């Protein structure tokens, strides 16, 4: 991974008193773009495992080992939870998360305290040291988008999101990730506001942004667009946790049952 990176503003009129990248990232005013975050071999491993799992699930569906879902909808999106659906990629997924934490420590140390409630020196150990990390439901994951696939505007509601492009640009048309200004989040959900920023970075690029940022996966017109995603916060210790917070935070967009996503994805491949 090269040390070069850039800051892409969501809010163009950044306050001069808080113009450092770490503060802007934590406040949801910008997205950090890290090229060459994930190399070709790592991408190939994730993609091979994801496509094999999709094919295996299709065989189960055809053979009757897995019953049809109660509802059918052509979402064009399949979400594969790495620990459960891609266990052979578990170590690689952890490696990418550690890499993101090390990047923040090295390049944006102030973001650790603001976004994850820890000092810069603690960042590299967050994944392994108690109490560990808490993920958005179903993550870390590999998302596969086929024609018509998209992810509606939502917020992840976690401390930090790491989104890594796995597909080369010539493998799909359409797509990209859209971001809205904080003031436009309600309008974005109603489809009444244009995004302030749309990014379609090359394969291997990571996007880092905060949990309150309204964003969406734009509609794929053809081909397959694949992403690795991990949205996480520092897990609260038992002494810090409240009874009402025993369940994980849920992203704002209603999530389909896994079976619904799978059936729609398989329909799109046929």
Spans of model-derived segments:
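Compositionally biased, intrinsically disordered low-complexity regions
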Residues: 30, 66-69, 78, 114, ...
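Generic detector of low-complexity/intrinsically disordered segments
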Residues: 16, 27, 63, 80-82, ...
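Double-stranded beta-helix
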Residues: 27-29, 54, 177, 182, ...
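Non-heme Fe(II)/2-oxoglutarate
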Residues: 5-129, 148, 246-249
């Amino acid at each position: 991974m090269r040390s070069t990176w850039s800051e892409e503003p969501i809010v163009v009129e950044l306050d001069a008193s808080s113009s450092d990248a770490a503060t802007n990232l934590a406040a949801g005013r910008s997205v950090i773009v890290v090229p060459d975050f994930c190399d070709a071999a790592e991408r190939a491993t994730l993609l091979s495992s994801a496509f094999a799992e999709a094919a295996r699930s299709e065989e189960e569906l055809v053979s009757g080992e897995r019953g049809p879902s109660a509802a059918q909808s052509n979402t064009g999106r399949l979400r594969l939870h790495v620990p459960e659906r891609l266990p052979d990629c578990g170590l690689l997924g952890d490696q990418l998360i550690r890499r993101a934490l090390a990047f923040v420590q090295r390049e944006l140390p102030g973001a650790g305290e603001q976004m994850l409630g820890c000092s810069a020196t603690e960042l590299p150990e967050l994944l392994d040291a108690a109490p560990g990390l808490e993920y958005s439901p179903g993550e870390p994951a590999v998302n596969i988008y086929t024609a018509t696939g998209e992810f509606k505007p939502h917020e992840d509601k976690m401390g930090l999101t790491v989104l890594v492009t796995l597909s080369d640009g010539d493998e799909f048309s359409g797509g990209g990730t859209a971001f809205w200004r904080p003031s436009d989040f309600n309008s974005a959900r109603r489809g009444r506001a244009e995004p302030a920023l749309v990014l379609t970075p090359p394969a291997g690029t990571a996007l880092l942004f905060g949990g309150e940022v309204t964003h969406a996966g734009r509609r794929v017109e053809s081909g397959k667009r694949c992403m690795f995603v991990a949205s996480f916060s520092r897990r609260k210790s038992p002494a810090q946790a409240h009874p009402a917070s025993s369940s994980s935070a849920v992203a704002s967009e209603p999530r389909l049952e896994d079976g619904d996503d799978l059936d729609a994805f398989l329909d799109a491949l046929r």
